[in-house]
Design a protein with these regions (language model features):
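Charged, low-complexity intrinsically disordered segments
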Residues: 1-184
Length: 184
């Protein structure tokens, strides 16, 4: 993985004018693609190994259930439409092992987002259009996938104030690099 929050902080320290795109929220704009498409909860269909998903949250939680052999929860996740329900079900996966999940979760999210963005040209164009900007999930509630701060708090502080890992932002930048390398 090329990105982590410490590398991002170092980039910004060396170049304080680095563009940072803060995103959070999944409500689409009916007229154009916006940064809401970066959300795990953004509703768009994509397929992985013959299975269709409608959010990367669904993909992540279904993959979590499969990783631990919980086919019942996998089925519930696949039959639910709400990403909030997917998240809730993902927390109930049987035989869950935090060590294994922590080793696999980022790769799972990268793979889901590769499918999401490569199979939806308008989303791919949006992600590629972010150029070399640092992508940051500005969720005040999430210190794993986000930075633990909302956009306003992040803008009024510095990267040193970020209290989260920003794994989603890192995953999306990884996907952007992959799309650029593949010229898809």
């Amino acid at each position: 993985m090329r990105y982590n929050v410490e590398k991002i902080k170092e980039i910004v320290r060396k170049n304080p004018t680095t563009e940072i795109i803060y995103f959070w929220g999944h409500t689409p704009n009916p007229k154009k693609i916006t940064k809401s498409c970066l959300s795990q909860w953004y509703d768009v269909y994509f397929e992985v190994d013959g299975v269709q998903y409608h959010t990367t949250e669904q993909y992540m939680m279904a993959s979590k259930a499969r990783l631990f052999g919980d086919e019942d929860t996998w089925s519930e996740i696949m039959n639910a439409y709400s990403p909030a329900v997917h998240k809730k079900l993902g927390r109930k996966v049987k035989e869950f092992d935090a060590t294994i999940w922590n080793e696999k979760k980022l790769d799972i999210v990268v793979e889901g987002n590769k499918a999401k963005f490569s199979q939806n040209p308008d989303l791919k164009d949006f992600l590629l259009g972010t150029g070399d900007a640092i992508l940051v999930e500005a969720s005040p509630y999430d210190k794993i996938w986000g930075i633990g701060l909302d956009r306003e708090a992040a803008l009024n502080g510095s990267v040193e104030d970020w209290d989260g890992e920003n794994l989603l932002g890192c995953a999306l930048m990884e996907v952007r690099d992959w799309l650029n390398d593949k010229h898809l």
